[in-house]
Curated annotation (Swiss-Prot):
Location(s), subcellular: Cell inner membrane
Tree of life domain: Bacteria
Originating species: Salmonella newport (strain SL254)
GO process annotations (BP): cobalamin biosynthetic process
Cofactors: Mg(2+)
Protein name (database record): Adenosylcobinamide-GDP ribazoletransferase
Keywords, in A-Z order: Cell inner membrane, Cell membrane, Cobalamin biosynthesis, Magnesium, Membrane, Transferase, Transmembrane, Transmembrane helix
């Protein structure tokens, strides 16, 4: 299990993980690592939250929010943001399904992808700033949001098909069991409710799961399935929706 955790941490983040810590683990086994996603989100969000706390007394809330969101993007290597941009470029091209998938494979950034990145990053910075002004504990909020975003992404894996013949997302999409889905969502809910007081964390998690489930159904109808890009989009939007639900 520890090998699986380190493999997942290296897979969806840019944190340095020695290769020997996950040595001997086959790529086909990665689907079992979905239950680790909320914990990885907890770590990434915790680092981002610490950066906010350290910088806020020095440069104020707006700049601290900017740098903590920038840190979060750097910690993931922009992996999920790239998926968000590619998904929006494809979906909003208003082409046939096959052409949408081709556009999503294109490494060049299109207008819709650029607008999506600007909107999501700016929205995160503004929401984090507003939450801090309202006295929300930002370490807890960011850690819970990142756990929720990664945990809710399982809703685009369970009982979904892969829209392409090959790709990284094929490791998870359609390969996750109902038990793994329940465990992943359960862990994300526990993290959110423990970190945030009262029913705030639970309510935000319910809103996030509902929104990501609807997103998954819309993407399934449009693309005929999911891809690694749509998983990245779900994670980014899940984080934002969770933070918005805390307002």
């Amino acid at each position: 299990m520890s090998k699986l955790f380190w493999a997942m941490l290296a897979f969806i983040s840019r944190l340095p993980v020695p290769s020997r810590w996950s040595q001997g683990l086959d790529f086909e086994q990665y689907s079992r690592g979905i239950v680790m996603f909320p914990f990885i989100g907890l770590i990434l969000g915790g680092v981002s939250g610490l950066i906010f706390i350290l910088l806020q007394p020095w440069c104020g809330i707006p700049l601290a929010a900017l740098f903590c969101i920038l840190a979060l993007a750097l910690l993931t290597g922009g992996f999920h943001l790239d998926g968000l941009a590619d998904t929006c470029d494809g979906i909003f091209s208003a082409r046939r399904r096959e052409r949408m998938l081709e556009i999503m494979r294109d490494s060049r950034l299109g207008t819709h992808g650029g607008l999506a990145l600007i909107f999501v990053l700016l929205a995160k910075i503004l929401v984090v700033s507003e939450l801090a002004l309202r006295g929300t504990p930002m370490l807890a909020a960011l850690a819970a949001a990142c756990a929720a975003g990664r945990g809710s992404a399982v809703l685009l894996m369970y009982r979904h098909r892969y829209a392409r013949e090959e790709g990284l997302g094929n490791v998870f999409i359609g390969k996750v069991s109902g038990r793994q889905t329940c465990i992943t969502l359960g862990l994300a809910i526990i993290i959110a409710t423990v970190l945030l007081p009262g029913m705030q964390g639970l309510a935000a998690m319910v809103v996030t799961c509902a929104a990501i489930f609807i997103l998954g159904q819309l993407l399934k109808r449009t693309l005929g399935g999911q891809t690694g890009d749509t998983l990245g989009a779900a994670i980014e939007l899940g984080e934002l929706i969770f933070l918005l639900a805390l307002l």
